[in-house]
């Protein structure tokens, strides 16, 4: 029960009567207030008011009146009690200031009146000021001094009875005003503590220098500075990178990913029963051993990304096909297929884009030129003739490198690998050059506000494009391949014809894809019929852009977009006002699931878009994805493969040179918003510092993987010889990194080596020396050969000059 509310007036806590039915309670409050008002109608009977939070104190301080049976102003028990509490705390904190009475302060706060709490009725602007020069001024003639002045007796009579009160009042005012007008100065530890009494130790005994620690035996101090220290000081930003810090940041950001081992779930899946819902399915004996030797791949040191390497066994393939290629929903609405290509042309193509593929001869000639280029630097082995191949049969494949998840659902759900339905390279090489030529022609006809990152050097860097104060629409067609059907094949045919692609070639392409597609997977032994799939070489990318652009233009007004980016199944629309887009309409019309990110951020192709200080847009890879890519389990134990992965890592980390402190803060905030994790901004900074550290050289990058000393040169701890341990019983903890030592220990360093014999790894000093000498000789061979050739040419020129001179003499 509150100390500011009397026991007989306390009914229920404020938060209860505010939420519940309060009619009867309000009437009781009004009746109690009316009783107190009637009791103190006579001003002479009013006692001194207090601020104890009771109804009586409210009547005495606020002085309400009864109008029509209701109290004005209304009496709020909880608000009045809280007001009294605040006034009491305020008065206790301002001890050196003369304030107005507490009931008056409570009345002003309760009625929300603006006025000062300081009592200014008796405070004037007088402030004591010492203007003397150190001596008292007296006139040379005393009679002149008293000539124009009043008699001393009259002055004393005028000030009689008031002098003492004035002096007391001024003394009080000076103390109160001086407490406010002290000039703030910097304080030290000497200002904070004042020693009151102390007693030093005796110095009769000769102390050693090392033993004199605290000569003050007894003392008491008094704290004079009334300042509360911060109990939890904020730590500065640390940029030092280490494996331990990166792993700690990863465990904080991804709660369910810590030390996740997928091998248990792999064995559980292979040993459990499997139920299939396919209508038509062919299965034969599988030739895949689901348990592969993991020692053939590098083991990452970090373990929070849940990056698993899947084996394409029969049950894994069936699980992936069931998740990715089955259970396609039916259409729930009707759409005019002929309007879709018209929207594509009107929304994305410029005035010169009408019939951009109409000149079919030029398209075919360009495609033939692409084919000749491919043939000039590729062998023709494996290239087949289309007339001798059944194009209705495809191959199925699953991605063994599973894309790691970023949601906290790893403890309840296991990722399913993605599937790919494709033609072989020999088949796609026959028609991909023609569709490449179509894509080139189509990209040249796009409007300036439409951007499609294509080509060998595909970049998301844009000049003079602003992102600040913009609205974003981030849409992802995550189930693009799964949701395709007859309708999308008709979209494809109409779009190609509308753009001017040859009609006979278009009809031929679409007709044989309407048939059932079936193909045995080579090793798992699974065959399943599929309908209208588009994972077929270059045209898959072309059709993804066509369909994504056309369906977005049909459901969204692209005229409101200042900039639109499309890359496969990812799309990003930048608008000056808030975009209006209904995913339900999109799904009901096109039988395709579209996922609109909330909140929508400048994010496309797993990259964030940031605006530089000069008004340009540059892309930054997702830090969450990049830290998970440092834990890949599909890198074979080969130096060249690991170095190639390091080169790819350095190429992706080029954005670090462009990050300012402002861009770094924005990137951390965008990452936290993207994954709805407000507490990972510090973790993102730790990851970025790790990226900058490990991209410096290959030896640092090798720390992220267990390389068994192949790339991390080590030497013995020099203090180990003082320890009573046999040199043949050293453990891994007694070795530390030393990049200047180029010799790996030849003695066994762990338990397994002592059990199975001496360490015999891929590192052999003799072989390394021979290989190094061979590289040096090979590097020196070319310069020597060029030097000898140049000397031979000079000798020939000299002989030729001598012959010419002899001819001239004759």
Curated annotation (Swiss-Prot):
Q: Which family does it belong to?
A: Belongs to the ssRNA positive-strand viruses RNA-directed RNA polymerase family.
GO process terms (BP): DNA-templated transcription
Please write the reaction equations for the catalytic activity of this protein: RNA(n) + a ribonucleoside 5'-triphosphate = RNA(n+1) + diphosphate
> Segment Disordered: which positions?
140-160
Query: Which species does the entry assign this protein to?
Result: Broad bean mottle virus
Q: Name one GO molecular function term.
A: RNA binding
| Enzyme Commission (EC) number | 2.7.7.48
Q: What is the protein named?
A: RNA-directed RNA polymerase 2a
Keyword tags: Nucleotidyltransferase, RNA-directed RNA polymerase, Transferase
């Amino acid at each position: 029960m509150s100390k500011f509310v009397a026991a007989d007036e306390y009914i229920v806590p404020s938060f209860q009567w505010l939420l519940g039915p309060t009619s009867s309670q309000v009437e009781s409050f009004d009746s109690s207030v009316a009783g107190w008002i009637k009791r103190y109608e006579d001003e002479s009977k009013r006692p001194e008011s207090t601020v104890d939070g009771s109804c009586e104190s409210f009547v005495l301080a606020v002085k309400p009146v009864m109008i029509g049976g209701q109290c004005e102003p209304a009496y709020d028990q909880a608000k009045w009690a809280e007001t009294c509490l605040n006034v009491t705390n305020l008065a206790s904190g301002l001890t050196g200031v003369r304030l107005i009475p507490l009931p008056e302060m409570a009345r002003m706060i309760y009625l929300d009146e603006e006025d000062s709490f300081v009592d200014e009725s008796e405070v004037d602007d007088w402030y004591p000021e010492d203007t003397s020069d150190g001596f008292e001024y007296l006139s040379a003639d005393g009679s002149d001094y008293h000539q124009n002045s009043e008699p001393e007796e009259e002055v004393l009579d005028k000030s009689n009875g008031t002098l003492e009160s004035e002096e007391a009042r001024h003394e009080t005012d000076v103390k109160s005003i001086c407490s406010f007008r002290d000039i703030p100065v910097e304080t030290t530890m000497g200002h904070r503590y004042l020693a009151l009494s102390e007693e030093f130790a005796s110095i009769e005994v000769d102390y050693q220098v090392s033993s004199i620690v605290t000569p003050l035996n007894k003392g008491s101090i008094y704290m004079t500075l009334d300042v509360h220290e911060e109990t939890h000081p904020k730590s500065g930003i640390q940029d030092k990178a280490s494996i331990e810090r990166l792993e700690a940041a990863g465990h904080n950001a991804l709660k369910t990913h810590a030390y996740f081992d997928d091998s248990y779930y792999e064995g559980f899946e292979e040993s459990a029963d499997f139920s299939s819902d396919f209508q038509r399915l062919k299965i034969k004996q599988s030739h895949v051993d689901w348990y592969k030797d993991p020692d053939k791949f590098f083991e990452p040191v970090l373990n929070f990304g849940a990056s698993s390497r899947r084996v394409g066994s029969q049950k894994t393939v069936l699980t992936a096909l069931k998740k990715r290629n089955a259970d396609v929903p039916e259409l729930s609405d009707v759409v005019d297929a002929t309007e879709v290509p018209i929207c594509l042309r009107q929304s994305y193509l410029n005035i010169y884009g009408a019939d951009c593929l109409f000149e079919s001869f030029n398209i075919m000639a360009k495609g033939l030129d692409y084919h000749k280029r491919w043939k000039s630097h590729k062998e023709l082995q494996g290239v087949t003739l289309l007339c001798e191949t059944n194009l209705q049969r495809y191959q199925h494949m699953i991605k063994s490198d599973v894309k790691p998840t970023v949601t906290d659902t790893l403890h309840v759900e296991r990722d399913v690998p993605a599937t790919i339905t494709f033609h072989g390279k020999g088949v796609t090489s026959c028609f991909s050059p023609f569709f490449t030529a179509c894509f080139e022609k189509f990209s040249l006809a796009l409007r300036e506000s439409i951007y499609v990152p294509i080509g060998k050097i595909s970049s998301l860097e844009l000049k003079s494009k602003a992102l600040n104060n913009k609205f974003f629409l981030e849409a992802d067609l995550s189930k693009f391949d799964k949701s395709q059907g007859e309708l999308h094949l008709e979209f494809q045919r109409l779009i190609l014809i509308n753009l001017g692609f040859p009609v006979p070639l278009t009809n031929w392409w679409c007709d044989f894809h309407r048939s059932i597609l079936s193909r045995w997977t080579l090793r798992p032994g699974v065959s399943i019929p599929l309908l209208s799939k588009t994972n077929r070489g270059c045209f898959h990318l072309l059709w993804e852009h066509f369909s994504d652009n056309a369906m977005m233009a049909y459901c969204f007004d692209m005229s409101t977009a200042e900039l639109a980016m499309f890359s496969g199944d990812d799309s990003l629309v930048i608008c000056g006002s808030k975009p209006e887009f209904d995913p339900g309409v999109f799904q009901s019309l096109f039988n395709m699931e579209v996922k609109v990110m909330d909140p929508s951020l400048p994010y496309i192709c797993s990259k964030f878009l940031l605006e530089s200080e000069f008004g340009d847009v540059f892309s930054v890879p997702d830090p969450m994805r990049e830290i998970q890519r440092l834990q890949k389990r599909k890198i074979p134990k080969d130096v060249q493969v690991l170095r190639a992965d390091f080169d790819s890592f350095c190429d992706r980390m080029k954005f670090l040179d462009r990050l300012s402190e402002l861009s770094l803060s924005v990137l951390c905030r965008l990452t936290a918003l993207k994954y709805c994790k407000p507490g990972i901004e510090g973790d993102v900074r730790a990851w970025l510092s790790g990226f900058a550290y490990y991209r410096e050289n290959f030896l640092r990058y090798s720390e992220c993987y267990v390389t068994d000393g192949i790339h991390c040169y080590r030497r013995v701890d020099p203090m180990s010889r003082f320890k009573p341990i046999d040199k043949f019983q050293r453990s891994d903890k007694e070795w530390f990194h030393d990049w200047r030592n180029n010799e790996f220990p030849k003695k066994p360093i762990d338990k397994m080596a002592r059990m199975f014999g001496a360490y015999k790894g891929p590192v052999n000093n003799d072989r390394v020396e021979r290989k190094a000498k061979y590289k040096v000789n090979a590097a020196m061979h070319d310069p020597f050969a060029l030097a000898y050739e140049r000397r031979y040419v000079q000798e020939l020129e000299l002989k030729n000059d001598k012959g010419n001179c002899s001819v001239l003499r004759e």
